[in-house]
Amino acid sequence: MTATITDINAHEILDSRANPTLEVRVTLSSQAYGCAAVPSGASTGEREAVELRDNNLERYGGKGVLQAVENVNGPIRDALLGQDPRSQEEIDRIMIELDGTENKANLGANAILGVSLAVAYAAANNADLPLYRYLGGDGGPFSMPVPMMNIINGGAHATNNLDFQEFMIVPVGAPTFAEALRYGAEVFHALKKRLVSRGLMSAVGDEGGFAPDLPNNEAAFELILEAIEDANYVPGKDIYLALDAASSELYQNGRYDFENNQLTSEEMIDRLTEWTKKYPVISIEDGLSENDWAGWKLLTERLENKVQLVGDDIFVTNPDILEKGIKKNIANAILVKLNQIGTLTETLATVGLAKSNKYGVIISHRSGETEDTTIADLAVATDARQIKTGSLCRSDRVAKYNRLLQIERELNDQAPYAGKEAFLFNRK
């Protein structure tokens, strides 16, 4: 007998920044159930689906999500009772139509996403399958993703003087995911030791990376290279560098406010190009603003065959916007964040569109996270080959890494570590 949805319940929990978010539980007639918690971003794209907040300044500084909880426990629950949880596309369609807006502003993308993911977990649990097998099929193909590890935080993720948001290490040369994690952890500790020895702050930012004040952004690269060598790895062979410039945060009146200079798009591109020549940079995310499409075209023409150019704010995990970018030859990879678009179905459509056009895919966390590990399963299920889930500390980040270790043990030879094959920029 087919199991159907018999109950949906949401409540407020806290995320990693002490802000409220939703956790949703979907229960089936078989007594199987699924739970999911929703993340939240700090630097958000203008075209992201809308996260519903209460704006009641007497609770959580206006950041409460009681209205979103009410939307789940009321109209969404009423609309989905009796549905087959395996009908993910239909369930997501019902919620989108019930919302009635292009950006999910009525019910809230946080409400809709929580239900969408909890439904998938309930269906997977009812089938006695882990989420990655339920979504990816029993035979895959599966691979273990290369982690992009954010070990120095700046921009909107920290309170230091660095303009760029994330300076990452990418352990491309590791033979397995478990070894990649070890590479990263050892560099993390080597970096901390260097910071302490220089009297620099070793406190961490939102995503678990260190947040020191440094003379300039290049100094972050230099520090990381020293830490890689201290840990006995070879930069540009064992471990590469990656950067999230989060340039939309720097863009005002057609210029980039960078290191106390007002740079044009061309000058920003020159700076990024210079760094790709000077350092072993394999990936640049949001090198230009989401509203600087002309600049993005120039950046892509300049660097598309040399480094991975990741669109985050410019694409916001939206298949329609990604399709426009593909036609205009903008970027060569996309960052995929579930809560930017608000349903599992639309997320999978975006991943499929990217892969069919040979765009790299990076499954990503948000700066406000929970212990939810959905993105780990999603990265394996979709054979995305890359994941971005923060640094090597803070349980909200490490939970995803530990889940990937579990999956690697379960799949063993069925899921080889993607390594350099994860990067498609030189094979388009």
UniProtKB/Swiss-Prot annotation:
UniProt xrefs under CDD domains: enolase (cd03313)
Catalysed reactions listed for this entry: (2R)-2-phosphoglycerate = phosphoenolpyruvate + H2O
Pathway(s) annotated for this protein in UniProt: Carbohydrate degradation; glycolysis; pyruvate from D-glyceraldehyde 3-phosphate: step 4/5
Residue numbers binding Mg(2+): 244, 285, 312
GO cellular component, one term: phosphopyruvate hydratase complex
Official protein name in the record: Enolase
Matching PROSITE patterns: ENOLASE (PS00164)
GO molecular function: magnesium ion binding; phosphopyruvate hydratase activity
Gene name, Swiss-Prot/TrEMBL: eno
Source organism per UniProt: Coxiella burnetii (strain Dugway 5J108-111)
Catalytic residues of the enzyme: 207 (proton donor), 337 (proton acceptor)
Cofactors (names): Mg(2+)
Family classification: Belongs to the enolase family.
Co-factor binding comment: Binds a second Mg(2+) ion via substrate during catalysis.
The protein's Enzyme Commission number: 4.2.1.11
EC main group: lyase
InterPro entries according to UniProt: Enolase (IPR000941), Enolase-like_C_sf (IPR036849), Enolase-like_N (IPR029017), Enolase_C (IPR020810), Enolase_CS (IPR020809), Enolase_N (IPR020811)
Assembly mode: Component of the RNA degradosome, a multiprotein complex involved in RNA processing and mRNA degradation.
Subcellular location as annotated: Cytoplasm; Secreted; Cell surface
